[in-house]
Amino acid sequence: MVVFSKTAALVLGLSSAVSAAPAPTRKGFTINQIARPANKTRTINLPGMYARSLAKFGGTVPQSVKEAASKGSAVTTPQNNDEEYLTPVTVGKSTLHLDFDTGSADLWVFSDELPSSEQTGHDLYTPSSSATKLSGYTWDISYGDGSSASGDVYRDTVTVGGVTTNKQAVEAASKISSEFVQNTANDGLLGLAFSSINTVQPKAQTTFFDTVKSQLDSPLFAVQLKHDAPGVYDFGYIDDSKYTGSITYTDADSSQGYWGFSTDGYSIGDGSSSSSGFSAIADTGTTLILLDDEIVSAYYEQVSGASGETEAGGYVFSCSTNPPDFTVVIGDYKAVVPGKYINYAPISTGSSTCFGGIQSNSGLGLSILGDVFLKSQYVVFNSEGPKLGFAAQA
């Protein structure tokens, strides 16, 4: 475990603007998420979202969650301050709004190869105007809630913030399920996990980050997601104004293609810390925190009126409840998730019952620390090592 001071972060994170070497020019840049309300009222199938997160990592989706997802038992309309936050990316000649996902390694997008009925409301990638097709290459992704997407693969120019590559594999959707079509705010996904889990066949392709990291000041990116506000991604440098104290580093386990790491314990509310650590993945593409049953049960024992209601597909409680904080111990650092973040959303529009931001990992064997966790932290994803760094947001 290494603690990294702000002074060191400033020295190592200098951008090309202050570099004395004229060539080759390297860069560091920041790109902001933006709010993307859909053209029509957006709904979220909460158990469907939960099922998709479990299946993404090869987990078993409980039958009760499958049934709740298929029945739409917990479909909610977010309030205005719960809009979807996405990131603008130029792909070929199109500007698309993508979900940045540290838990996957594909860059796939809505394209004009989709049937016209599935294009409505989305910004589209038009490969014929700029791309070279990778003949014989395809991709196909499916999730635990029944959603799926597939299509052909192209080589094209992709620009994120201040960095451009003309050698990026872009996966253009030609088939896509209704779950994706209905979310007209989102035009696709940009994976930031390790390239080893890219799904393109017959040969996996590199992620955008792996393609461009040699252009960056440092081969890293840092994430500052926010609660009820757009977040920020810093590529190539660490912004010391975005965190307090010091950054605590721990080794990242990339053996499964994810940003995995080991924690050193946890605590609930004002309770003492448990020394029982657990293996986890830092995933911007998962909304919830998914933990071992023992930890989940211990947490909801401290939430008045909470129940593992099978009809809703997960733990629920009264929306008026103030759940306790949840703390993850990483070395000497304690990453605190405020309880209000765990009061995630009403199980249906206007309901007084809320779906919990902490749910079971269904025996997955590792925990997923998704956005509910990440929105309290400034997290550094460094490919050298690799390693992960954590600090409280400023």
From Swiss-Prot:
Single GO molecular-function term?
Answer: aspartic-type endopeptidase activity
Keyword vocabulary terms for this entry: Aspartyl protease, Disulfide bond, Hydrolase, Protease, Secreted, Signal, Zymogen
**Which Gene Ontology BP terms does the record give?**
proteolysis
Q: Transferase among the record's keywords?
A: no
Which cysteine-cysteine pairs are annotated as disulfide bonds in the entry? Answer: C319-C354
Q: What is its EC number?
A: 3.4.23.18
Residue intervals of the Peptidase A1 domain: 85-391
Tell me which positions the record assigns to the signal sequence. Answer: 1-20
Propeptide residue intervals: 21-69
Q: Which CDD domains match?
A: Aspergillopepsin_like (cd06097)
Name the catalysed reactions. Answer: Hydrolysis of proteins with broad specificity. Generally favors hydrophobic residues in P1 and P1', but also accepts Lys in P1, which leads to activation of trypsinogen. Does not clot milk
Query: What subcellular locations does the record give?
Result: Secreted
Q: Which family does it belong to?
A: Belongs to the peptidase A1 family.
**The protein, known as:** Aspergillopepsin-1
Q: Which organism is it from?
A: Aspergillus awamori
